[in-house]
């Protein structure tokens, strides 16, 4: 009996209404760049188990890395539900396996990549960012091979394999009185669509273009954000405020603005889980439900929250 099956059997034996168990296995390759050279190459493997219990509409979540302690974790989770409030919105775990498949979310070449091949990619990032006006280059390359498996007490059982690659270079210059820097960044899901040279070029060009900055007069200006900056804003500033849980608990700055205007008419924001090469692209979410495109803001109006 597998660890996941053992967990579900145990939850049923002790009378839990619903149970969901996931295991995530990751092979992670990291190349670290400091002082314009590769200083570290490491490969790690980790395995994590996640358990969600629903009992009398009370929801408890537990995480462990020890498969031998998974039944004990379920016992502790059941005790936790005694102190929780019921979630009346709860309608049950999914029981239908979705079969939608998206191309470009798994690459066998990334799964099988060696440390030396990863180092070659990182070296290309360094080489393309070198310039006589640049003094120091730092950065990193990360490659992840992920195996996600989910089982629940409704009979749903599915497995999903993914690969990810992400690189970043920070080029610094002290050629002028004021130190400046430039960032190059790219990420994706397949090796063929990933360009280490573009990362280095972007960092180099931004850094060189920032040398000897000029003052401007006070006034109102339009700002054009780099894609990397937009990603940072969306990930760490905007996304959390659209989370359904955050909204329902009145912790979002938009909690009182659902279906109301929150931005300029020209602004639209969409959560698209099917974008090619997207880091968050997936056909099925972590509960086994088919993903779909969601309009968060349409013509300035807050239309939908994010459920995750």
Where does each model-flagged region fall?
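Active-site bordering "gate/hinge" segments
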Residues: 1-282, 286-292, 298-301
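Transmembrane alpha-helix/helix-exit interface in multi-pass inner-membrane proteins
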Residues: 307-308
């Amino acid at each position: 009996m597998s660890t996941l099956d053992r967990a579900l059997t145990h939850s049923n034996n002790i009378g839990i209404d619903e149970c969901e168990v996931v295991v995530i296995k990751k092979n992670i390759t990291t190349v670290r760049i400091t002082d314009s050279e590769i200083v570290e190459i490491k490969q790690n493997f980790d395995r994590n188990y996640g358990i969600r219990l629903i009992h009398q509409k009370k929801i408890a979540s537990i995480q462990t890395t020890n498969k031998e302690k998974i039944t004990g974790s379920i016992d502790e989770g059941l005790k936790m539900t005694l102190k929780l409030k019921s979630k009346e919105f709860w309608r049950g775990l999914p029981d239908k396996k979705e079969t939608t498949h998206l191309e470009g979310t798994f690459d066998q070449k990334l799964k099988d990549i060696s440390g030396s091949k990863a180092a070659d990619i990182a070296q290309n990032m360094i080489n393309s960012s070198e310039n006589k006006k640049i003094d120091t280059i730092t950065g990193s390359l990360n490659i992840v091979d992920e195996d996600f498996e989910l089982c629940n007490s409704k009979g749903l059982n599915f497995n999903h394999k993914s690969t990810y690659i992400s690189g970043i270079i920070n080029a610094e210059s002290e050629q002028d009185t004021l130190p400046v820097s430039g960032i190059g960044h790219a990420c994706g899901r397949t090796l063929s669509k990933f360009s280490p040279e573009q990362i280095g070029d972007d960092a180099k060009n931004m850094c060189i273009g920032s040398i000897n900055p000029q003052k401007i007069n006070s006034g109102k200006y339009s700002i054009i954000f780099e894609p990397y900056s937009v990603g940072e804003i969306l990930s760490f500033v905007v996304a959390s405020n659209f989370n359904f849980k955050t909204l329902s608990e009145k912790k979002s700055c938009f909690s009182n603005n659902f279906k109301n205007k929150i931005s300029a008419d020209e602004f639209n924001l969409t959560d698209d889980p099917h974008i090619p090469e997207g880091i968050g692209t997936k056909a099925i979410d972590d509960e086994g439900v088919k993903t779909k495109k969601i309009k968060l803001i349409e013509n300035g109006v807050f239309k939908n929250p994010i459920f995750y």
